[in-house]
Amino acid sequence: MKPLIMLICFAVILLQLGVTKVCQHNEVQLGNECCPPCGSGQRVTKVCTDYTSVTCTPCPNGTYVSGLYNCTDCTQCNVTQVMIRNCTSTNNTVCAPKNHTYFSTPGVQHHKQRQQNHTAHITVKQGKSGRHTLAWLSLFIFLVGIILLILYLIAAYRSERCQQCCSIGKIFYRTL
């Protein structure tokens, strides 16, 4: 009987790990809650609950929103760099080396093309979100857990020890 109790506990734990809350397209996941997003240039100062809405605060001048909760100081380009884009409340300053044609910042790929009059054109491509990857990974872990649970139950009921002590095991063993 102890293996069955342990197996049930294991299944409950796997179910808890495998269940992920999926928010609607117009919501963001904050902890275990799905909340409406903050406005542009604002950070989360208090997470929503079932009874209250999310509380947002604008980032002060000279900072930009970094993630959902933080305002980060804007980067200052140094003397060996050229400023490509000014810092705003939603995006950091984009700096590039004066003599290079390619550069990158985390999560964003940039390509700078110099023309004869030394103006720059930038193409920006955002990185992909990891939310779908997390959902698929959770589903995979859940399914592997269920398969292991089924295999364990079959092995337990087929064992001689279980057949001798459990009438259910004898019935189950005969049907397989």
UniProtKB/Swiss-Prot annotation:
InterPro entries: TNFR/NGFR_Cys_rich_reg, TNFRSF14/UL144_N. Its main location: membrane. SUPFAM superfamilies: TNF receptor-like (SSF57586). GO terms for cellular component: membrane. Gene3D superfamilies: Tumor Necrosis Factor Receptor, subunit A, domain 2. Disulfide bonds join C23-C34, C35-C48, C38-C56, C59-C71, C74-C87, C77-C95. Coiled coil: none annotated. GO terms for biological process: defense response to Gram-negative bacterium; defense response to Gram-positive bacterium; negative regulation of alpha-beta T cell proliferation; positive regulation of cytokine production involved in immune response; positive regulation of T cell migration; symbiont-mediated activation of host NF-kappaB cascade. Keywords: Activation of host NF-kappa-B by virus, Disulfide bond, Host-virus interaction, Membrane, Repeat, Signal, Transmembrane, Transmembrane helix. It is a single-pass membrane protein. The chain crosses the membrane at residues 134-154. The keyword Membrane applies. It holds the Pfam family TNFR_c6. CDD domains: TNFRSF14. It is found in: Membrane. TNFR-Cys repeats lie at residues 22-56, 58-95. PANTHER family: TUMOR NECROSIS FACTOR RECEPTOR SUPERFAMILY MEMBER 14. Activates NF-kappaB in a tumor necrosis factor receptor (TNFR)-associated factor 6 (TRAF6)-dependent manner, causing the up-regulation of the chemokine CCL22. Interacts with host TRIM23; this interaction causes auto-ubiquitination of TRAF6, leading to NF-kappaB activation. This is Membrane glycoprotein UL144.
